[in-house]
A protein has these predicted regions:
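N-terminal glycine-rich phosphate-binding loop and ensuing alpha1 helix
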Residues: 1-58
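Residue-level signal for inorganic ion chemistry
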Residues: 6, 32, 89, 102-103, ...
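Hydrophobic packing residues within well-ordered alpha-helices of enzyme cores
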Residues: 15, 39, 60-64, 117, ...
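Conserved N-terminal catalytic core of the sugar/cofactor nucleotidyltransferase
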Residues: 33-96
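Residues at the starts of beta-strands that form the adenosine-phosphate
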Residues: 46-48, 126, 193
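Conserved beta-loop-beta/alpha segment of the NTase-like Rossmann-fold superfamily
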Residues: 80-144, 158
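A recurrent flexible, glycine/aromatic-enriched loop bordering the glycosyltransferase active site
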Residues: 147-157
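Conserved alpha/beta core of the MobA/IspD/sugar-nucleotide pyrophosphorylase nucleotidyltransferase superfamily
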Residues: 155-221
């Protein structure tokens, strides 16, 4: 059985926008609607869980009504951090199956990437999509000096980060630590090693106004 937890706790501050970024409309619909539609098109039998702050849930219901969003999904309240939000999402899932944990503001994930993540997680336990870094990298030190580092030793990490449910649930029993930047870091802290799969360039996390413009063009194609 396949599950997807869509984490949508954004505030929209970097957008210079009062509307939380997952609700900003592009190509005729809120970003979050595009994201869940993408997963539904990938697999209509997937169980979708959206994690939203309590004070945004009524607004989301209204948006679903306005935009006629009828894709079946459960909504669970977000927590104090992303870690706690994912934990709340996991609490709705039985202990068997494969779960993809995905950013609500990544509506352009290629279906081949989602399929690869599910397939590899089923085989190996955990899978995360990554991309090589196109730009040069520099490390900055406390005294403001910097030095070039080898970018081939690094990758950019995307979502959906996908795991066997029993393993990621076990990992999320660990006490919260602020070094947990994503689900893979929690998974690793529990002693597991996620496999890396190839991501897709268009799978951008909509964070800045320029991302909105790019996503709008892609979604209208």
């Amino acid at each position: 059985k396949r599950y997807a937890i869509i984490v949508a706790g954004g505030k929209g501050t970097r957008m210079g926008n009062d509307i939380p970024k997952q609700f900003i409309e592009i190509a005729g619909k809120p970003i979050l609607a595009h994201t869940i539609e993408n997963f539904y098109r990938f697999d209509p039998n997937i169980d979708l869980i959206i994690v939203l702050p309590q004070n945004q849930q009524e607004y989301w219901k209204r948006l679903c009504s306005i935009h006629r969003i009828t894709i079946p999904h459960l909504v669970v309240k977000g927590g104090e951090t992303r870690f706690h939000s994912v934990l709340n999402g996991l609490s709705l899932i039985p202990d068997e199956g494969i779960v993809a944990i995905h950013d609500g503001v990544r509506p352009l994930t290629a279906h081949r990437v989602i399929e690869n993540c599910f397939h590899v997680a089923e085989e190996k336990g955990g899978a995360i999509p990554v991309l090589p870094l196109p730009d040069s990298l520099r490390q900055i030190f406390p005294d403001k000096s910097s030095k070039a580092v080898d970018r081939t030793a690094f990758v950019a990490v995307q979502t959906p980060q996908t795991f066997r449910v029993e393993e990621i649930k076990k990992a999320y029993k660990l006490p919260y630590n602020d070094t947990f930047t994503d689900d893979a870091s929690v998974y690793e802290a529990a002693g597991y090693i996620p496999e890396l799969v190839e991501g897709n360039r268009e799978n951008l996390k909509i964070t800045l106004p320029v991302d909105l413009a790019i996503a709008e063009i892609r979604l209208k194609e």
